[in-house]
């Protein structure tokens, strides 16, 4: 919504809540409300909303990837890794999941596998190198963004 573009989170949330009052399973509204809650720093609520969006529309890969990122933000590394690996098996060309798994694996010390996933992600979508794009447009949580940027700093250094 325009409110999201203006970072008016309460107005944006009100728009999505209005939609959800009429259709509690509207996957797009659930996902977008998850983005709003994440932008407000409420990653627990964000995770719940992304998961509900993915359940409402099972092929909604971005909702599942966002749920994995929110789980990672809350230190559920094993849950995040499992979900990202499932996404990559199902959608091998899904750059978001590959980029996220790169940062997560690097954080866990698996640098070789991280580099392998990053090679695929970078070839699919070079925007994942851009911190501001990750935070402001794609709206990754701070922890995954920091880890991916740290990984890339070593790769570039």
Kindly give the residue locations of the regions a language model identified.
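Structural signature of tandem alpha-helical TPR/SEL1-like repeats
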Residues: 5-18, 39-52, 74-86, 110-117
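Terminal, low-structured helical/coil segments at or just beyond the last alpha-helical repeat
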Residues: 120-157
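Helix-start (N-cap) detector for alpha-helical repeat units in TPR-like alpha-solenoids
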Residues: 27-28, 43, 61-62, 95-96, ...
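TPR/TPR-like (Sel1-like) alpha-helical repeat modules
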Residues: 72, 85-95, 99-129
């Amino acid at each position: 919504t325009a409110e999201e573009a203006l970072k008016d989170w309460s107005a944006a949330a009100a728009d999505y809540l209005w939609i959800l009052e009429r259709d509690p399973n509207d996957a797009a509204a659930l996902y977008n409300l998850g983005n709003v809650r994440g932008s407000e720093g409420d990653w627990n609520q964000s995770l719940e909303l992304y998961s509900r969006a993915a359940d409402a529309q099972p092929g909604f890969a971005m909702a599942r990837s966002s749920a994995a990122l929110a789980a990672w933000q809350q230190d559920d590394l094993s849950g995040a890794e499992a979900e990202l690996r499932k996404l990559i098996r199902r959608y091998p060309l899904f750059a978001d999941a590959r980029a996220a798994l790169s940062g997560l694996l690097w954080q866990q010390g698996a640098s070789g596998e991280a580099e392998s996933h990053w090679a695929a992600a970078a070839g699919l979508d070079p925007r994942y190198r851009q911190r501001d794009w990750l935070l402001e447009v794609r709206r990754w949580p701070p922890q995954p963004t920091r880890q991916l940027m740290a990984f890339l700093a070593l790769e570039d250094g």
